Swiss-Prot record:
GTP binds at residues 14-21, 61-65, 122-125. This is GTPase Era. Monomer. PANTHER family: GTPASE ERA, GTPASE ERA, MITOCHONDRIAL. It comes from the Bacteria. Its main location: cytoplasm.
Amino acid sequence: MPEGFRCGMVAIVGRPNVGKSTLMNALVGQKVSITSRKAQTTRHRITGIQTTDDAQFVFVDTPGFQTRHATALNRSLNRAVTSTLTSVDAVLFVVEAGRYGPDDAKVLSLLPRETPVILIVNKVDRLDAYTRAEMVAVFLQEMAQVFPFKEIVPMSAKNRDDILRLLGIVRPYLPEGEPMYDPEALTDRSERFLAAEIVREKVFRWTGDELPYSSTVVVDKFETEGRLRRVFVTILVDRDAHKAMIIGAKGAKLKQISTEARMDMEKLFDGKVYLEVWVKVKSGWADNEAGLRAYGYE
């Protein structure tokens, strides 16, 4: 590695649905964290790795901090957020441009004062083009009074130039040192884990507002033979009615979920995928501490 090479961990935090996973995928240059317009899409800490000529960035995408429903699942998600903050070199605190409310403030109150915090003002591209510059300027002034941020970065996670600029801003906050991961690595998560996340993303996209939060995905079997993967998964739901919603009329919705998931897996794994998806009812799974640990939650 060249002299002055830097390597460190950077947490991406914020309230649900501010674009944390989209930002991480853009920073890594590959889809490693699932996205959805619905809140609570991310349920696990996902590590994304970006290695450049002079640095390795290890980004940790955390679940959005949950303040409204005191289930065992949401307690698990919040533990994932708070435990991450104790082990990183810098924090990217993500808010939506023009919007800062009680849920954002709750997350900000958890951030350690001794760790550099960089404010990411995301989704500036969604503001009205005629008033954008003025609105952003006012919002940045307001946010500068809220917390001693090391940097304040207005941007869009969908803009490649903004992403490159952000990497340059973050690099000085990483300690000098050897890379933690192979330069070709994109994530520390297994293909088995990523397969479950991809199926869960499709459930989020193809079902109503209530259902995603009462469902999870379990990989029953994951086999690799050359470039072929055989993946067998079960979608667990809370009620019979939810099972019917996922399956859809004559199995149409389940087929759509399965087809899109298989295509995403083939793109990510760079090979053919045989995918079988089943739906089962397991009442109360989201409020069972022992069961959640068995499904990989903290």
